[in-house]
Amino acid sequence: MLITVYCVRRDLTEVTFSLQVNPDFELSNFRVLCELESGVPAEEAQIVYMEQLLTDDHCSLGSYGLKDGDMVVLLQKDNVGLRTPGRTPNHPRADFTGSGSAVPGTSSSRHPHQHQHHYHHHQRIPSTQQAHGLASGENMTFAQELDSPALIRSMLLSNPHDLSLLKERNPALAEALLSGNLETFSQVLMEQQRERTLREQEMFRLYSTNPFDQETQARIEEEIRQQNIEENMNIAMEEAPESFGQVAMLYINCKVNGHPLKAFVDSGAQMTIMSQACAERCNIMRLVDRRWGGVAKGVGTQRIMGRVHLAQIQIEGDFLQCSFSILEEQPMDILLGLDMLRRHQCSIDLKKNVLVIGTTGSQTHFLPEGELPLCAKLLSGTVQEESSDREVGGTIKHPVKGPGRKKH
């Protein structure tokens, strides 16, 4: 089996190498092989695997659970002074995730065998696990756990995964890291550690004075709630990272009165609507029955100018009858609501990414993001536009009839 060894020497230099060994290979012989590759004397070498120190030289590597493709950490005794990895009674494990739990993708996650390349080192040698932890800054451990900002900085810069986590969860520290100034990075890091220490001291004071005090109980409850939220988010980021992305809305190509349009398919909308500007381009404003005007209320309010009782909409080769409620201000041209979808027995097939017209049997593909109208594209500065879309969606679900509006 192939074992990768991450070695930290006495002078803090690092080297990584791989060794081809058998599962029944004894630990003492493995140390000798590591000495040939790293120059670290076998008697000074400490081997760490899955946060556990391997001590019995007469045990085989297989008995420790090592398998093909695994990684171990080799630390030199004298300068490193390795302590047993994991939590100790007085000092919590280095964890900067804001939840008290391991960052997704580390060896203490729910599936440790899938994340075998993250380990704890000595307090002077922050491990990859600790570097992962820098990704939030919410839950900083004691400053003495990490007294080498230069080493932390170099480890983060050399690991793209850790750097991406840092950008997501601790933008301030990431900005200091990418500035290229070690002094700035050290200041931000130490400041966050100090803030964490002060928070821990405050919580300890509350616990020690009167743990049954109403204010203390409220603080404890809030602390537990925040930890549960962070843990839930961390699990979601590990198990379902796609849930943090945005999805493109469902649009199709269509034509009204010969004019090509991009229609938003919304099965949650009560009725099919069209913007005033689009109705003017399609030359159907002359058919608007203003007796059906009113105010639509939902997330916001919009004025309904009236209704076009009958028009034709072309989807692929099919010409379908449709009615439109005309809204005065709307970001999208046309929205196909439940009235039109039910009328033509349409079904949304997300597996095939098509809209199926039940009455004709034809289907049309939903548009990719690159072909969406500007108001629907997933751009960083479009929060307001997306909010407008949601407003329209809510607006058409709760129409309020005007004085002259008739009942459907």
From Swiss-Prot:
Residue numbers spanned by region Disordered: 82-135, 386-408
Signal peptide extent: none
Residues at the catalytic site: 266
Gene3D superfamilies, A to Z: Acid Proteases, Phosphatidylinositol 3-kinase Catalytic Subunit, Chain A, domain 1
Pfam families: Asp_protease, Ddi2_HDD, ubiquitin
SUPFAM superfamilies named in the record: Acid proteases (SSF50630), Ubiquitin-like (SSF54236)
Polar residues bias spans: 98-109
Stretches assigned to the Ubiquitin-like domain: 1-81
Similarity comment text for this entry: Belongs to the DDI1 family.
PANTHER family noted in UniProt: DNA DAMAGE INDUCIBLE 1 HOMOLOG 2 (PTHR15397:SF3), SODIUM-GLUCOSE COTRANSPORTER REGULATORY PROTEIN -RELATED (PTHR15397)
Function noted in UniProt: Probable aspartic protease. Seems to act as a proteasomal shuttle which links the proteasome and replication fork proteins like RTF2. Required, with DDI2, for cellular survival following replication stress. Together or redudantly with DDI2, removes RTF2 from stalled forks to allow cell cycle progression after replication stress and maintains genome integrity.
Protein name: Protein DDI1 homolog 1
